[in-house]
Amino acid sequence: MKLLAAEDFIDNTSDAELSPSVIKIMSGALDAIAARGIRRLSMSDIIDASGVSRGTLYRYFSSKEEVLAAVSEYVCTGFENGIREAGHGIADPIERFKAVMIFYARYTNENSPDRVFEVEPRFHLEFFRSHFDRFNRAVKHALRPVFDHLDQLVGEAINRDAFAETLVRTQLSTLLVPASDEWQRLWNDTAENVEKWAHKFALVQPREAGKD
């Protein structure tokens, strides 16, 4: 089943995206997908899982497809807003980097329940494929001061697009193989390790240049 694009429904729900009822519907829909899968999912399942009345559900969404599109947008927007807020107001670039990395790992764990991926892998795959560029942009934007700092350390511009995409692809891999405690520790230590690498690179460059 192909999900509707967000613009196919957003005009009908933009005024209520943050209302308690819509949030309950989104959360309930995710639970229902995990329990039933998309093909078997019905509007009644969403009503039961979210605890809203039939009238409330149909006030915002006229079909299951609209709910699924809204769920995709809800999860993606939540990531974009959350990763931006994670680093907001943190002046130290490495501390900002740490905060962003910790948020990203937590968000993946809390918003991509294993049961959904097991029951409905197609939903996950289509979601991440259609929102992949937005995830990359959100990470790159959140780490902009970090990239500025690293550019200064190494004396040249790093590839920001590749850096951000590597982080996104790495975090997505944990949906297939859950992260161990050791891997999680390495992920959380990425900021400090990258800074150490940048310092070492900066020290080596002048010596290498002197050999030429």
Protein language model regions, located:
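Basic, helix-initiating cap at the start of DNA-binding domains
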Residues: 1-49, 66-69, 88
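Short hydrophobic clusters on alpha-helical segments that form packing/core surfaces
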Residues: 25-33, 75, 79, 83, ...
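Short hydrophobic/aromatic patch on the recognition helix
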Residues: 50-61
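Hydrophobic/aromatic residues within well-ordered alpha-helical segments
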Residues: 64, 71, 75, 79, ...
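Hydrophobic alpha-helical connector segments
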Residues: 70, 84-112, 164
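Amphipathic alpha-helical segments used for helix-helix packing
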Residues: 108-130
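Amphipathic alpha-helical packing segments from all-alpha helical-bundle domains
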Residues: 125-154, 161-165
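Hydrophobic/aromatic-rich alpha-helical bundle segments in the mid-to-C-terminal region
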Residues: 150-197, 207-212
